[in-house]
């Protein structure tokens, strides 16, 4: 009986945690980090503020976890492209275009996760996840060097440039102040332009 109660308690605790993070993500996707206050998150999750603090020391910890979960999803997408049978050039084009288009499909969430002003702890997490994206892009570039599709002396710098292009290029279209609306066709066009640019920058001439 004690084991059963312990198991049920653990399950309930995990569910509470998931509910808190899911609520925080929903709030961020609708209004940004500025709207993701502990009280608001608790109300959205249907729990007390005190319960939120049982799982997280402060708001920044909640935001960092939401950021980590979101970027892990993007990394899985990029890594699946990296491990595919496509050529290095095709992998790079698809990885960049997919990342940009997914950002445009969730504009407020993407803007908040990448650009909205935050405290230093969340900014540090942003830096960490960009390093992970760079690692995947660097692998594609290395494959391209090996196949002769690319000729790059400094893979790390080239990967940084690609990550910079695929992330910062969406600052303007994602900025909530711009209130920009993109239809499906324009998202395809915009993401293709960025992917074309990145491939052209590194491919063998």
Description of each model-found segment:
Residues 111, 115, 145-196, 205:
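Hydrophobic/aromatic-rich alpha-helical bundle segments in the mid-to-C-terminal region
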Residues 56, 114-120:
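Short helix-capping/turn signature of helix-turn-helix
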Residues 72-79, 105, 121-147, 156-160, ...:
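Amphipathic alpha-helical packing segments from all-alpha helical-bundle domains
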Residues 21, 93, 97, 134, ...:
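An amphipathic alpha-helix signature
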């Amino acid at each position: 009986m004690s084991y059963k109660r312990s198991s049920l308690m653990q399950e309930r605790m995990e569910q509470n945690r998931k509910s808190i993070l899911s609520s925080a993500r929903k709030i961020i996707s609708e209004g940004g980090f500025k709207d993701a206050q502990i009280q608001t998150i608790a109300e959205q999750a249907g729990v007390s503020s005190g319960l939120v603090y049982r799982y997280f020391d402060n708001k920044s910890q909640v935001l960092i976890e939401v950021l980590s979960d979101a970027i892990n999803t993007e990394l899985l997408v990029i890594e699946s492209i990296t491990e595919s049978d496509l050529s290095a050039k095709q992998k790079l084009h698809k990885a960049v275009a997919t990342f940009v288009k997914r950002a445009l499909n969730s504009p407020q969430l993407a803007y908040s996760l990448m650009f909205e002003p935050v405290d230093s702890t969340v900014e540090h997490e942003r830096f960490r996840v960009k390093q992970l994206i760079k690692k995947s892009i660097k692998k594609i570039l290395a494959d391209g060097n090996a196949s002769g599709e690319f000729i790059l002396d400094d893979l790390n710098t080239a990967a940084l440039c690609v990550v910079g292009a695929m992330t910062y290029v969406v600052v303007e279209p994602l900025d909530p102040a711009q209130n920009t609306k993109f239809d499906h066709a324009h998202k395809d066009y915009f993401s293709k332009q960025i992917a074309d640019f990145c491939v052209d920058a590194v491919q063998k001439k």
